[in-house]
Amino acid sequence: MSVNEHKKEAPHVIRCKIVTVSDTRTEETDKSGKLMMQLLREAGHEIVAYEIVKDEKEAIRAAVIRGCEHPEIDVVLTNGGTGIAKRDVTIETVKEIIEKEIVGFGELFRMLSYTEDIGSAAMLSRAIAGVLDGKAIFSTPGSTGAVRLAMTKLILPELGHVVREIRKDWR
């Protein structure tokens, strides 16, 4: 079966949880979380849950696992906490809990960041995607530019396809 055939069979409405990882953001100041929600809704998807957690491994782990255990959520998307500062632990936390990594997501995100956005600073960009308990997880940097790039160029075009592939044998 071709990729196009897979996409035709993919679900059209994906139920999502957004997790913003930040020590400083509030619901009022969380531009990246709001942008994720806006782009998902514009594409016809649903936001089932949203939360902001501190840059702490246990808080991140708990928020992601809650999303993956929720029966009405298909995908968990995180933003923030992906840099190289000591407190940036989102990537390490997600990497520890996923059962399977979608390696191409991080690779393509850095390539697009380099060619379309921030040039050589892309080598500092960290992004990861994977699967836990039959749910997809995508983790992006917290800048609105990075969120827009990841969402419009990678996540939204493949979201239904990713969920379809996971559902084939994870449930």
Q: Where do the protein language model's features map onto the residues?
A:
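Non-catalytic beta/alpha edge segments that cap or flank active sites
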Residues: M1-R171
